[in-house]
Amino acid sequence: MTQPTPPERPTDFDPVLVTRMVSSFGHNGALGARYVAHGTDWVELALDYRAELVGDEETKVLASGPVIALMDMATSLATWVRRGRFEPQATLDLRVDYLRAAVPERTVIGHGECYRLTRRIAFVRGFAHDGDPADPIAHVAGTFMMTEVA
Amino acid sequence: MGAWPTLPPYGHFLGITVEEGPLFRMPFGISVTGRPHFVHGGALAGLLEIAAVGTVMEALRDEAGAHVKPINVTVDFMRGGRERDTFAAATVLRLGNRIANVEAFAWQEDRAKLIASARMTLMVRRAASGGEG
């Protein structure tokens, strides 16, 4: 069995800077997620409500897609803070449970955690809420594969 | 075309268009880019969900007032999406009174070479309920 890499101390990897870089470009840039906070194995991002991200015109509820993108980004960052450095990786799979609809106009907070890290695979989980962490809107679980590890 | 689906604002945000089938097309562009030269996984997941929901809505088109809510989705990413159109289509595995199970697939130049797939469970709300669940 592969030995997991123990959580490292905060090192060169700066999630504040990386979030700003990643959010300046492409799909993440178009979504506009912001850095909120981080710990040794978790990162929290915020996604502000925008009319163009609505999934249902009648209810004005945020679509589920932006929540997936937010959680993909928060959990990715969590793997790098846990590892203490950036390592190229690809998302293998991501499961999202939509616990309830986000309240229109509210900012969504995405909390991503890397709970196990091996040489090649990162196991992540997380949740999203719109104000109260005890009343989440979504729960996620997923895995990433390191793409440049032999 | 007249057929469903009327895309939600998020569908337009991703640049998705719908063709006969329904077949969903998402052109490559800066707003769906992840790492440089590749489609973002979140945008792919969004396309797969829109294909899944759109295909269920198409199956429900004769029922006025029917709508769906996502319960969960599992997305598998199999290949990087390159700088070209991405297509998606979905199969409704079961359409019950309350629950729909759907599978959606995304590909680029070759339909046999999937770049991502998703399994989605949806809650179905019908205007007038009846019959077997």
Describe every region a protein language model picked out:
Chain A
Residues 15-25, 77-86:
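Short, solvent-exposed helix-to-loop capping segments enriched in aromatics
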Residues 2-12, 102-109, 113-150:
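HotDog/MaoC-like acyl-thioester-processing domains
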Residues 32-62:
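Catalytic strand-loop segment that frames the active site of acyl-thioester-processing enzymes
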